Curated annotation (Swiss-Prot):
Family per record: Belongs to the cytochrome P450 family.
List of residues binding heme: 481
Cofactor: heme
Source organism of this protein record: Pisum sativum (Garden pea)
Entry's Gene Ontology cellular component terms: membrane
E.C. number(s) listed in UniProt: 1.14.-.-
Protein name, UniProt field: Cytochrome P450 82A1
Keywords: Heme, Iron, Membrane, Metal-binding, Monooxygenase, Oxidoreductase
Any GO MF annotation of the entry: iron ion binding
Localization (cell): Membrane
Coiled coil: none
Length: 544
């Protein structure tokens, strides 16, 4: 929910209209047991004003569990939404009733910005979704293709690390003169902040993950000193991603009160159309480039050299799917892969670093694991990742505390059913509060504490892949995140290499700010400034 546009004037205007209709509203007497509905609903607006709370919506609704229990209903304008806050109810939804909750609603943002639900993640449950999901999982995001593109992930991580080492080297050289191996950061001297260089990690992770995803998807990179085609275009592209993620989570007045949609209160529909158009122009250019390359014989490329757009062109072969033409399908899928693969991955990496900086003993223990298995003379390889059990525990604990989408992606009941003994009507939206489920004290002792060790002992068999309903950062059932495997590959590999390559300090005596902002995903509200210094042999960096 992004509801800041609901300013006092807007609320007053809608409230005035609602009074004119209030006397004409009739409620039918229900003879079935329905979940409790929270108090404070406004005419027409429902509980939308409640979402303007200073807290994020998942925290606001999580605080209501003590009063209303783990299952209750809220009204989003004219639409009912079912909020679930424990794992048993989530399991009931995503197993026995999964097919009933496998469709998606169609808010204004999705209609205007996802090529009218051509995104696989936003498509309604049906033939189009099934066919495209099969293509994406078998041809685009299969483990085989992820493995074939490992050289891109390695190249991007090593390039980004080397560029950061060069920044450090240039700064130190300007301060102390030319470096030699005697001034290597691998010495055991006590650290001095003058030996470190400042880096804004939130931005660094965003640029690295975007480069990595763009190369895998369309064969391009936007940031850095190597093979960057147009830096101004890259800057605009990143800004447009930020706009998209903000707007796609916007619940407009038209969503809650459909007959007021034409007013476009707040101007969000206009902004959405503008953002979508910018992406469409760029995607058309990339698609045309790939078609030209295909005509020049790029179809004969070695499989590992094909990017995702190449693969889509080969698989679809100009055959439309359920009314969507091939160009629309490729553009929609390409954009979705870029957005989902870069933004959520960078966000998880940022939260992981926040937690590690707030808990230096955990950071030190992870560094020890890296030094034990990898040493100081080489970089981390993807083949090393499975051995790094403490790293895996840290990522799981990060995803527990900061699930990328705290309400998962919205679902919609396609028929009446029963959840938790309550009758749920067709058309109700489903909002599993993952943030609350992940902090259930009956499942997670000390639920607010960052304790990766729990995944090495009491919760060692709990995974994030949708089968353990107490931990669902990627959702579960038919509609769980299709890009989960790729995202996890990227998170583990990037974090391991970054922490193995640098010593990290908090530049401020103040604790790390972990204020959240919920757009479509939960992100850190402020930059993450850290100090870094290379800690490997310089021969290791030179070999990158």
């Amino acid at each position: 929910f992004v509801l800041n546009y609901l300013n006092t004037t807007t609320i007053a205007f809608i409230s005035l209209i609602s009074l004119l209709f209030f006397l004409f509203r009739f409620s039918k007497v229900s003879h079935t047991k329905e979940p409790p509905i929270i108090s404070g609903s406004w005419p027409l607006l429902g509980h939308l004003p409640l979402m303007r709370n200073t807290q994020t919506p998942h925290k606001t609704l999580g605080a209501l569990v003590d009063k209303y229990g783990p299952i209750f209903t809220i009204k989003l304008g004219a639409t009912n939404a079912l909020v679930l806050s424990n794992w048993e109810l989530a399991k009931e939804c995503f197993t026995k009733n999964d097919i009933v909750v496998s469709s998606r609603p169609k808010p204004v943002a999705v209609e205007l910005m996802s090529y009218n639900q051509a995104f696989i993640g936003w498509a309604p449950y049906g033939a189009y979704w099934r066919q495209l999901r099969k293509i994406v999982t078998l041809e685009i995001l299969s483990n085989r293709r992820i493995e074939l593109l490992s050289h891109i992930r390695v190249s991007e991580v090593q390039t980004s690390i080397k560029e950061l080492v060069n920044v450090w080297s240039n700064q130190i050289s300007s301060q102390y003169g030319l470096l030699d191996d005697t001034k290597s950061s691998s010495t055991n001297d006590e650290p001095s902040t003058t030996d470190y260089v400042s880096v804004e990690l939130k931005k660094w992770f965003a640029q690295l993950t975007l480069n990595m995803v763009l190369r895998m998807v369309v064969g391009k990179r936007c940031f850095g000193d190597v093979d960057v085609e147009n830096k101004e275009e890259a800057k605009r592209f990143l800004e447009n991603i930020r706009d998209f993620m903000r707007l796609i989570g916007t619940f407009t007045v038209g969503d809650g009160v459909p007959f007021l949609k034409w007013l476009d209160l707040g101007g969000h529909e206009k902004e959405m159309k503008k953002c979508a158009k910018k992406f469409d122009v760029m995607l058309n250019e990339w698609l045309e480039e790939h078609r030209e390359k295909k005509g020049l014989g790029s179809e004969d490329k070695v499989v590992g050299e094909r990017d995702f757009m190449d693969a889509m062109l080969l698989v679809l072969k100009d055959k439309p799917i359920e009314g969507f033409d091939v160009d629309t399908i490729i553009k929609a899928t390409t954009l979705e892969l870029i957005l989902g693969g870069s933004d959520t991955t960078a966000g998880t990496l940022t939260w992981a670093m926040c937690l590690l900086l707030k808990h230096p003993h955990v950071l030190e223990k992870l560094k020890e694991e890296l030094n034990t298995y990898i040493g100081k003379e080489r970089c981390v390889n993807e083949s090393d990742i499975n051995k790094l059990v403490y790293l895996h525990a840290i990522i799981k604990e990060t995803l527990r505390l900061y699930p990328p989408a705290p309400f998962s992606s919205p679902r919609e009941f396609t028929e009446d059913c029963t959840i938790g003994g309550y009758h749920i009507k067709k058309g109700t939206r489903l909002m599993p509060n993952l943030w609350k489920i992940h902090r259930d004290p009956s499942v997670w002792p000390d639920p607010l504490e960052f304790k990766p060790e729990r995944f090495l002992s009491t919760h060692k068999d709990v995974d994030v892949r949708g089968q353990n309903f107490e931990l669902l950062p990627f959702g579960s059932g038919r509609r769980m995140c299709a890009g989960m495997s790729l995202g996890l590959h990227m998170v583990h590999y990037i974090l391991a290499n970054f922490l193995h390559s640098f010593e990290i300090l908090n530049p401020s005596p103040e604790s790390i700010d972990v204020t959240e902002v919920l757009e479509f995903v939960t992100t850190k509200a402020t930059p993450l400034e850290v100090l870094v210094k290379p800690c490997l042999s310089f021969k290791c960096y030179e070999s990158m």
